[in-house]
């Protein structure tokens, strides 16, 4: 019995232990499940929060972009509206200016008419006085006629009538001549004014320097070279003076010949861009620049011919036209002057129902002699006539060239128009400068004196005419003869030129030995 009770007791204890263990295991499992569920809920909440945040950011960006677009559209509309307002205001100002000009013109016309009316009133008063005198005279004559026979009275009346008609005829002829002259002058003035108003031209004075910009100050030393070899080579090959001073990152090219100066500028730009600067490279770039300059000159000529709508020009003549772009006359660019003359002559020819193309052609090449006047003897008129004859231009064009300075008589109205257009172009304010022309002419004369010697290969006036650099053939001139040549040129300069200060004469005799290794 006791054993049974003990067994039951142990069974109960064991059952309770097992139950406690099972219950504890279930509670632990529930805790783990709850923690897992909480973790899932937290992750889900975080994901939803991130999604909501991204959606909010997208909505905010869209809203900001929409607002930005609205602001831009509003700004553009306002800007467009302001531009329209400005345009309307400008149009209104222009209309007011036109109305003001019209009113001024009307006032001037009214004043002129008032003066004419006053003049006519004065004439009427004078005629009234004259008529009264004539009436008195006629009455006196009638009294005399009353004492004459019928035949004598008839003869006297016929004689007086004939004399009166003769005087009236002479007065009418004189009045017609004066009216025709006045109308012709007025018509000519109107034609010239219309041509000038339709032709726009720049008033730009040509200069004798060009500036080359450098990437750094160190480039100046490379341009000068060791012991100045590079700069001397460039100056000798181009005849242009290089001025290297304290001006930051720039070199000034000085020379009166625009072609030489442009060649030197092109060569120096190429050398600076390439970076290799030495005497042999300088010679190569100068030669390349000369070829490029020939092409540029041709393009300038073609552009001028195309601008004026001319055809049938000889290619060599077109190239000569391009060379005029690098010539100046009293500071005025010769090509621009010639184009302006061609346009003026063409417009006046159109007003007078003449050949417009022929007038433009004659105007364009009227100064063609200036393209070669530095190389060939003779005035630019003589050289221009020779060139026009060489390229088979029409006699009217040749005569326009020959007569535009009054050297020969004009044989056609076209020649007169060209001369008038030339005078208009040269006479407008700012077109020409006497001092620059005299300066350039002095430099040309200085070079001509040096080149007049047979031993001279070429000569360049540099340093604004304070130095002439003479290059001679080493096979023809010795060192001793070079000194004599410098003295002779110096004497010729002193005798033939007037100049301030002094002029340095430098004779360069250079010997080169060249061989090739194979």
Swiss-Prot record:
Function: Endoribonuclease that initiates mRNA decay.
The enzyme's E.C. designation: 3.1.-.-
Gene3D superfamilies: Hypothetical protein af1432, K Homology domain, type 1
Biological processes annotated in GO: mRNA catabolic process
Family: Belongs to the RNase Y family.
Segments traversing the membrane: 2-22
MF terms (GO), sorted A to Z: RNA binding; RNA endonuclease activity
Membrane-topology annotation of the record: Single-pass membrane protein
Gene name of the encoded protein: rny
HAMAP family: RNase_Y
Localization per record: Cell membrane
Record's keyword annotation contains Nucleus: no
Protein name per the record: Ribonuclease Y
